[in-house]
Structure formats: C-alpha cells, structure tokens
Amino acid sequence: RQRLDSSHVIGLVSHMSRLECVQETLRLALEALEPIEALARPVAWSVWWERYVASKLDYRTEAEPLRAKMAQAGQDAHDLLRWAKGQEGARAARKAVELLERVYAENFEEASGEAVDQRRAQPPGAVHNPHDPEAQWSTKKTTAQKEWVGYKVQVAETVEAQPRAAKEPTR
C-alpha cells in the first residue's frame, strides 16, 4: 500500500515586491561583476552602483515614482545585460548575470530593442527573491488563506500489508 501526503516548506527568504526583486538582482549582478577592471566597465557603472548597491528603496514613496523606478531598473538591467554579453571578465559572474537575465525576462518586455515595458503579470515559476530563485510564491485557499514563498513537498510512504485476523482494527 502507498500513502501520499503533501506539505509546504517555507523558504528562508523575505517576501519582496517585484521592484525589490529586480533591484536586488541588479545589486547582486553588479557586486559579482565588480572585479572587472574599471577601464572595462561601462560609463554608467558609477550611476548603477550608487542606485542599486549604495542606496536602499524607500517604501513610503508614492506609486508614480515607484513605477518610474521600475522602468529605470528595467532599462538599467537591459543595458547591463547587453554590456555583460560582450565581456570576457563577465564569465566569472555567469550565474549572477544569468539570474539577472531571467528576472529581466520575467518582469519586462522589449518594445523596440531599447525601451522596456513592465509585464502585467509574472509567469508561473517566476523568481520572487534572488537569494533563493527556486523558491516559489504559493497560496492555499482554505478557511484562512495561506500565502508563502518556499517549496511544495510530496511524500510517498510505502507500507507492506500486514496479515491480520478477522475483525482486527487497522493500524
């Protein structure tokens, strides 16, 4: 006999907004690319560094400036990815660049090669925290709705059937 059970495992990551996720992924990519010598870096490097590594997002900002920051982050990610593809030194930071490429593709659409538009909805399996990109956002609709970022786990138990006497309770 086989018994199946499922549960959820909460990831050890904070819940991030889409803007936070994009900005944090940009920060991780910039830090991974930092060992590249200064002369090989793009002109906008110091601006990106100030924008994503040296400063933090103010959550009390109104919606319109947050939309502008998301558009700016999308353009910066686009420019950084385009620059990183042509760099020999960027190979050492391959994982961070690939993660940035994934987050960029999940959050933005290219309109005319340069301009980027924010996607209305993220695809299933989208990155919700760059520190654990495999952790997924999930919800369970019960009497009290549960939401979490983490993993779903299914466990299968196999039990050999035990011979029992008639009218004996099952175990």
PLM features per residue range, with description:
Residues 1-171:
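Polybasic low-complexity intrinsically disordered regions
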